Amino acid sequence: EQRPVEKLNWFEAMEYCRRIKKRLPTEWEWEWAARAGSVSKFYWGEEDPELHGWFKKNSEKKTHPVGLKLPNSFGIYDMGGNVWEWTNSYRETTGGKVIRGGSWRNSINAMQSSKWITSLPIHRFHYVGFRCAKTVPSVANN
């Protein structure tokens, strides 16, 4: 089973991404990838949320293997629910690193594309994971 990695603090998530020559996305990159061009509250629009993510109502209080729900229009899976995801962004107002996406233990509202929470980077949670991002070199137009 390919369940999401969880229970890593922000530093451990950063180190893992660095080792594979990637990085944590910023919260804005994360939201852009999650929305996949949508402007609605949820990236799936008016479709049944149970087709798109694991949350309190359908998760049976646990994570699930990745990729079982429908992807967004960019083809990215699990951008809502299953586990919250660390980002590389920091909010001075809360003193914490930004976490996005909602998890299996939250209501559907946590899966809104714009929803965020924060945590101190030293904390580990059984409902927070991460995904790595890769910087793509820009191509100069000549």
Question: Model segments located where?
Answer:
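Functional-site microenvironments in short loops/helix caps that host divalent-cation chemistry
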Residues: E1-H126, N141
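Short, structured beta-strand segments at or near domain termini in extracellular proteins/domains
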Residues: H126-A140
